[in-house]
Amino acid sequence: MRFLLFFLSLGLFSAGQAAMARPWLYVSTFAYAGTGEECLDNAADALREEGFTRDFEVKRFKGKSRNAGGHVDGKLRNYPVVAKIECDQSLGVTGLAVTGIDNELTYEKYSVLYDKSW
């Protein structure tokens, strides 16, 4: 009887596959004519206003292109959602990426940031 219970429990718990959690990713790029510093400052404000304050970082490009931009990224305090805004004055573009496990929350945060200006 003990072996039967063992094999029954083994069959119940090993038959299914592990749950696969796949993140959602939303990305956009925009033309940008301002300076790299303006973009970084405004991007930092936009992310903070939307709650991306955990592991918050502003990183400027190194070397001669330091004033040409960099990136700002952060995570929501209590949810697994990450946002990143990159500013590149030399290319005249800025990029936005938001990723997370919860599609509704990820898209909501992406939409709000998409509508902001930095």
Predicted feature locations:
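Amphipathic N-proximal alpha-helical interface segments
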Residues: K75-G95
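Terminal, regulation- and interaction-focused segments at domain boundaries
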Residues: A19-D55
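Bacterial N-terminal signal peptides
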Residues: L5-S14
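C-terminal partner/receptor-binding element of secreted or periplasmic proteins
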Residues: D102-W118
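A cross-family detector of function-defining hotspots
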Residues: E50-R77
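Extracytoplasmic/periplasmic, Sec-exported soluble proteins
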Residues: A31-C39, K75, V98-T106
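Short, surface-exposed coil-to-beta transition loops
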Residues: L25-V27, R77-A83, E108
